[in-house]
Amino acid sequence: MTVAVTNIRVEDKLYQNRYVVDAGRPHIRVRPHDWPSVNLYALTSVCPAKCYELNDQGQVEVIADGCMECGTCRVLCEASGDIEWNYPRGGFGVLFKFG
């Protein structure tokens, strides 16, 4: 018996996800800072959705539109107060489709 093997890339699976953006009400906010903490800076590398990036002034910004709500940023930064994280309002956020 032969089993067909299909190679599906992670990016292709993630593309199946859908996002309902709550315009003007992001569920993640980065607290104002002069210089990012080590953990906040780490989010620019470890966020699987790449929601965090450095701006021209060297500060970390978040664009929560593609957030997968995995909680990585909560584990790294919420206790220190670097970010403010809330669940999206009902009907908004990520809709996983593992097609």
From Swiss-Prot:
4Fe-4S ferredoxin-type domain mapped to chain residues: 58-88
Pfam family, one: Fer4_ETF_QO
GO MF, one annotated term: iron ion binding
GO biological process: nitrogen fixation
Extent of the signal sequence: none
PROSITE patterns assigned: 4FE4S_FER_1, 4FE4S_FER_2
Domain of life per record: Bacteria
InterPro entries membership: 4Fe4S_Fe-S-bd (IPR017896), 4Fe4S_Fe_S_CS (IPR017900), ETF-QO/FixX_C (IPR007859), Fd_FixX (IPR012206)
Keywords (A to Z) from UniProt: Electron transport, Iron, Iron-sulfur, Metal-binding, Nitrogen fixation, Transport
Family that this chain belongs to: To ferredoxins from P.putida and C.tartarivorum, ferredoxin I from A.vinelandii, ferredoxin II from D.desulfuricans.
Purpose of the protein: Could be a 3Fe-4S cluster-containing protein.
Name used for this protein in its record: Ferredoxin-like protein
Organism of provenance: Rhizobium leguminosarum bv. phaseoli
